[in-house]
Amino acid sequence: MKKISRKEYASMYGPTTGDKVRLGDTDLIAEVEHDYTIYGEELKFGGGKTLREGMSQSNNPSKEELDLIITNALIVDYTGIYKADIGIKDGKIAGIGKGGNKDMQDGVKNNLSVGPATEALAGEGLIVTAGGIDTHIHFISPQQIPTAFASGVTTMIGGGTGPADGTNATTITPGRRNLKFMLRAAEEYSMNFGFLAKGNVSNDASLADQIEAGAIGFKIHEDWGTTPSAINHALDVADKYDVQVAIHTDTLNEAGCVEDTMAAIAGRTMHTFHTEGAGGGHAPDIIKVAGEHNILPASTNPTIPFTVNTEAEHMDMLMVCHHLDKSIKEDVQFADSRIRPQTIAAEDTLHDMGIFSITSSDSQAMGRVGEVITRTWQTADKNKKEFGRLKEEKGDNDNFRIKRYLSKYTINPAIAHGISEYVGSVEVGKVADLVLWSPAFFGVKPNMIIKGGFIALSQMGDANASIPTPQPVYYREMFAHHGKAKYDANITFVSQAAYDKGIKEELGLERQVLPVKNCRNITKKDMQFNDTTAHIEVNSETYHVFVDGKEVTSKPANKVSLAQLFSIF
């Protein structure tokens, strides 16, 4: 049998077991844990290659044959870092493993059968991840949606109605009429959506009406009054309807301190936004809730990674987002109370420890909607450079750290909001919302985004050129974005109650509509690779953060990876 070098093999079929791949210009090294393709039986499309009739393609049509096969992909997922063919059928991942012609090749299962109806996409040399999920969206402008999509985010969860002051400050779509408006507006876009209703209501009937109108949960925000009563009522109704509650706590400690909020939560599950506190929350010690078993703690991306510029840029952002006035002393003091370098410095470290479980944007409201994925990987790289390899690593790679950080914007937000049955990972049975990356541009610029099994966005050259690659090459919407195809490729998530009442038919929605599930019986221990609980304290005078009695901090970076080098053109 003829043998070829690993270098030759990787150039033809992509990396195999034991090969290592650097992510962008970071120090993060992914090692291929397993290769499910079979040596000598690899799929390869093109002239003189194997993916053709009578060879790796069956001549016999069958009900199992795939709509699309992605060949030789390097899958980076919370489930593992491995090489496989990915089969897609009816908009879902039908199989992961060895694809091809089961009549001619060993190891091909029915769910990876290539037949006359199968399209091919060459995944060799590319990384495939699940689409990102951003759970902290202020729906201020619809232009956020293509921006997020081009970064690799395929699901947006949040609230708002446009550039109203309520939406500029809070991620809330309040009331039945506003929810109807946003659910109908969502029909236009290549993106999955879920909308959060106003939880600042001490009236169960008003809360319930919003869930039955299609909201997937509540947001409680201090600008609407985050009182213990509102917290208790929102959680009571959430428990009844099996939806999540997200919270931005009381920075000014007007209605109580962090201990009062935790008492009102009373051990029930809660998704805490920007849990460090610069984005809002009990000053100076909201960060301590991140260690609790019933809290699903998230960061927003303005504070990660911690850099020499982080503190300076926050003041102006905060004044605009929360309708404050620099000429009013109390407004300035309010802003100052939220911007604490000591707790921001601790945030990066808490991410590396797996105490913070989720990353999100806080779009146009102190956060950048197109940078969730980039900043998550910048934080991972900054922490490796500062603290070295994690103790959990096995072998000469960063696979554990990679899975930890990937989970923060994929599977964990999906679990938190009850959509992990559908999205959030590269697993059989889930919707084929996939992002394809060149390793050199990983975390910054996707090559292509597949939405519901079809290509929705891709880097594409001049449409008048003789081949697809001539300049100018930039992101262009593909066929899955157009016509009625976009209804098949995208999902609007609603509550089970709204789904059962026929909200899709009531509002005349044409997209897929699916119910959220299993939001209330989860805890921190369900957060993949980010389930660490701990006792966290904050010194009320110095703002230094202590985890189980030991101070945690990090240094501000003066240079980060995945930055200007990738944005020259």
Swiss-Prot record:
Keywords: Cytoplasm, Hydrolase, Metal-binding, Nickel. Its cofactor is Ni cation. It is found in: Cytoplasm. The modification N6-carboxylysine is found at K219. The active site is at H322 (proton donor). It is an enzyme of class 3 (hydrolase). Residues 131-569 form the Urease domain. Ni(2+) 1 binds at H136, H138, K219, D362. Its EC number is 3.5.1.5. Its main location: cytoplasm. Substrate binds at H221. Carboxylation allows a single lysine to coordinate two nickel ions. Pfam families: Amidohydro_1 (PF01979), Urease_alpha (PF00449). It comes from the Bacteria. One of its GO terms (molecular function) is urease activity. GO terms for cellular component: cytoplasm. It catalyses: urea + 2 H2O + H(+) = hydrogencarbonate + 2 NH4(+). GO terms for biological process: urea catabolic process. Pathway: Nitrogen metabolism; urea degradation; CO(2) and NH(3) from urea (urease route): step 1/1. Binds 2 nickel ions per subunit. Ni(2+) 2 binds at K219, H248, H274. Heterohexamer of 3 UreA (alpha) and 3 UreB (beta) subunits. Belongs to the metallo-dependent hydrolases superfamily. Urease alpha subunit family. This is Urease subunit beta. The lineage of its organism: Bacteria, Pseudomonadati, Campylobacterota, Epsilonproteobacteria, Campylobacterales.
